[in-house]
């Protein structure tokens, strides 16, 4: 537990042939590292959508961990990490970055609960989008927290449940998200492939 209370998730669609992965690793990663060092954010990771195709609406998810929601937009400019850039270099970078990707969506969650069996970031995150009926949120969170007791005896490397807080309303497609973390695809299949009978407690 690194003390994070909020998670920002940005859904990115890359443009083929524009090398957004290189931009991500050489520029935005450096900015994130500086923001972490300065204490503005607590963590930053880029996750590739393994099942994405040309028709998928996103192929990268950028996850930012925050303790203070007011720091979400603080110290974000690329010049914070590369103060030596000239105006022309900055303009060229902004043009290249803009042409290499589209920001499809950006969401903010508060961390309800999580549990990890290891210090390092797992290799695979399986996202489960949940729609919880208004008025049932407390009982739903209580039920999800009950799963935590089973993590140690499962193939999971970690688990989390997040409540969406950037938007509310009955028209939302989801208002919660659970995340199952694994290190190998074979561990994912150990849980996903079998069909289990659900107990009355979790129906």
Segments from the language model and where they lie:
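Short S/T/G/P-rich N-terminal loop/turn motif that feeds into the first structured element of a domain
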Residues: 1-86, 91-203
